[in-house]
């Protein structure tokens, strides 16, 4: 107890000193050490420092109440432009001659800011930001919150939600919880506001030095906030954050207001590049795929649905009927070797990336193939919150390269983080759960979703708030066939488990209604056989039998190339190389369109090669299963047409 009291007194004294400094009002003064410098060197250096000061926000200059010594040093590493300790700003003396003769404005460095002069100017701004960050420039409300939360943190093991991330703060910006949200040091689930140690927003970074730690992130981003007019469009949330903090913003470009994304759908005939336009998004839903008995699926799958209005339709409830335009945001373990290993999922060996998919594909994937239902419940978001969320979605899509853990960083955790970081109000809600159904319950408990849309099952189906598993439909069809044909099987699963020959034995006895039911069931059997064939090919292709693997030949090469080349669908930044950062801007859209179309055409060609070759690679049992099921479909179709004609119906072709 005495130790805790002592720590409390020590913390209060330190905080009081910091608050006193933060409240002081004085002008920044950069004091050049002129010893050993010629008049020309002094003049050129002073012009550089004056140029930097003109760029700084007024609040920044007023809050730094100290004289900061500036001197040229010969002791810095050759590649370093400068550095700052707690008292001095040092610049690399090797850069002084070109500053004096003006050639630094023409020397291209290959670094993010271009010329040597711009890099040197950025260095001064960067290092001054470290001084400002240490100054604890807080508003009175922030000071009071930090003071009260800091005291609680030293006297209690449990902090209220508003204090998480506030207790023990020591910096103006770099330990602000909202800054950390936007920067990419995401909150951990069930860890009372603790943060991930790594920042995984590494794609489309202007300078990977920024993810070293939050202090460097703030300093690097201040460079671009002050020097790059496109920063407001490339990193709009951070630009607003800095502008709000300083009560000031430099001039910046007008932003296009929509964000490109790569469509990760499996139809290679569709345009690969799409656009997230906040003006066309009516609502955002939490989309839950219900669980099944599979070990990786028993708790469901968390996704988010964008209710996108058809072109020309006014934004409103009718947009819910424009299903062909709706999109799904789904975090998945992108498996570039097509192998789903529970062990690798537990150890984080899979990358985790945000896929943007057409709703129709997702509905088919879950309801028809996996036989799982979907629930789609609207999130209670305002129009500005929807716009902020879409902006964050685009940022994650282009920049995030996470690690997928089935328990601690799965689809539910990633979806929670997207909501937490994308909508400031949701960051204040305690939603940190680790299962998809748990996230649904948390959203419902916090009154953040409207689950009343599910109260009337028929209306929920009609309006697209629910998509039933085809299992119920298949069971209903099987019930029709069982009653009419006196089938011995108890349920649809038992019927589908029969061989194609065993199912065929019942076809000739079927009347019109039973034949229609059997046709739908045979289509389900065919989808199941295709899935089993794909699984067999995957297991053999990835297996250890070299002789077996060698049989893949041309098809194996196509499969391997598809797996390699489709990686850009989950990491779209690959299409733009190393130029640019943040959200792609109009000047990059043409390259993005051309490169994505080129990649997609190549994938389409590879897919055709694979389709033509792959059936011969199946085991005789799998190949026969597909062939016989296709024959069953032809036979049932012919039988159904004959029965329909005999009953006086229209002749079906």
Residues of each region from the PLM?
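Glycine-rich catalytic cores of cysteine/serine-nucleophile enzymes that process amide/ester linkages
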Residues: 82, 88-123, 151, 280-371, ...
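Bacterial N-terminal signal peptides that target proteins for export
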Residues: 2-12
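Auxiliary, metal-adjacent structural segments of Zn-dependent hydrolase domains
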Residues: 27-102, 164
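Bacterial N-terminal signal peptides
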Residues: 11-22
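Active-site-adjacent bridging/hinge elements
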Residues: 189-198, 274-281, 296-297, 301, ...
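Catalytic glutamate of the conserved HExxH
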Residues: 123-135
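Second-shell loop/turn segments in exported
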Residues: 34-43, 107-119, 204-209, 289-293, ...
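Activation targets extended, charge/polar-rich intrinsically disordered C-terminal tails
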Residues: 103-109, 119, 134, 138-210, ...
């Amino acid at each position: 107890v005495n130790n805790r009291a002592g720590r409390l007194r020590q913390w209060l004294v330190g905080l009081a000193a910091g608050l006193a400094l933060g409240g002081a009002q004085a002008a920044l003064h950069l004091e050049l050490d002129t010893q050993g410098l010629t008049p020309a060197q002094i003049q050129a250096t002073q012009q550089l420092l004056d140029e930097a000061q003109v760029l700084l926000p007024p609040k920044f200059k007023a809050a730094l109440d100290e004289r900061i010594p500036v001197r040229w040093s010969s002791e810095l590493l050759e590649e370093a432009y400068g550095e700052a300790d707690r008292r001095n700003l040092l610049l690399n003396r090797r850069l002084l001659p070109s500053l004096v003769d003006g050639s630094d404005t023409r020397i291209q460095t290959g670094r993010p800011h271009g010329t040597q002069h711009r890099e040197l100017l950025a260095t001064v701004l960067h290092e001054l930001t470290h001084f400002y960050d240490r100054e604890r420039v807080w508003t009175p409300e922030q000071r009071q919150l930090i003071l009260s939360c800091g005291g609680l943190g030293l006297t209690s093991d449990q902090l209220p939600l508003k204090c998480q991330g506030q207790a023990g703060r020591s910096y103006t910006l770099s330990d602000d919880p909202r800054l950390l949200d936007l920067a990419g040091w995401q909150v951990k689930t069930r860890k009372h506001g603790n943060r991930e140690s790594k920042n995984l927003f590494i794609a489309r970074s202007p300078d990977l030095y920024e993810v070293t730690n939050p202090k460097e992130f703030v300093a690097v981003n201040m460079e671009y906030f002050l020097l790059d007019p496109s920063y407001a469009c490339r990193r709009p949330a951070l630009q607003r954050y800095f502008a709000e903090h300083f009560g000031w913003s430099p001039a910046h470009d007008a932003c296009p207001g929509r964000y490109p994304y790569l469509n990760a759908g499996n139809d290679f005939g569709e345009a690969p590049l799409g656009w997230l336009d906040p003006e066309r998004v009516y609502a955002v839903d939490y989309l839950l795929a219900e669980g099944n008995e599979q070990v990786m699926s028993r708790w469901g799958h968390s996704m988010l649905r964008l209710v996108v209005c058809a072109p020309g339709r006014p934004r409103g409830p009718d947009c819910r009927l424009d299903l062909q335009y709706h999109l799904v945001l789904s975090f998945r373990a992108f498996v570039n070797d097509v192998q789903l290993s529970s062990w690798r999922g537990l150890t984080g060996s899979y990358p985790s990336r945000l896929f943007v998919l057409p709703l129709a594909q997702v509905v088919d994937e879950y309801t028809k193939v996996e036989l799982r239902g979907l629930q789609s419940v609207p999130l209670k978001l305002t129009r500005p919150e929807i716009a902020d969320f879409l902006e964050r979605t685009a940022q994650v899509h282009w920049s995030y390269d996470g690690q997928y853990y089935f328990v601690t960083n799965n689809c539910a955790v990633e979806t929670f983080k997207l909501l937490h970081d994308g909508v400031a109000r949701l960051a204040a809600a305690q939603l940190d759960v680790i299962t998809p159904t748990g996230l649904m319950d948390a959203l419902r408990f916090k009154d953040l979703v409207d689950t009343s849309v599910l109260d009337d099952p028929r209306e929920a189906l009609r309006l697209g708030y629910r998509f039933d598993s085809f299992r119920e439909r298949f069971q209903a069809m099987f019930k029709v066939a069982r009653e009419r044909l006196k089938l011995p099987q108890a349920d649809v699963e038992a019927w589908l488990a029969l061989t194609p020959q065993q199912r065929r034995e019942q076809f000739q006895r079927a009347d019109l209604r039973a034949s229609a039911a059997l046709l739908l069931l045979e289509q389900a059997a065919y989808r199941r056989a295709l899935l089993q064939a794909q699984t067999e090919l995957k297991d053999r292709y990835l297996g250890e039998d070299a002789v077996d693997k060698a049989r893949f030949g041309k098809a194996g090469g196509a499969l391997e190339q598809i797996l390699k080349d489709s990686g850009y669908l989950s990491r779209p930044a690959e299409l733009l190389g190393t130029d640019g950062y943040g959200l792609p801007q109009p000047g990059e859209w043409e390259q993005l369109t051309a490169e994505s179309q080129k990649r997609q055409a190549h994938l389409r060609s590879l897919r055709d090669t694979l389709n033509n070759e792959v059936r011969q690679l199946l085991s005789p049992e799998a190949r026969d299963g597909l062939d016989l099921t296709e024959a069953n479909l032809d036979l049932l179709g012919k039988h159904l047409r004959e029965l329909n004609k005999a009953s006086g119906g229209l002749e079906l072709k």
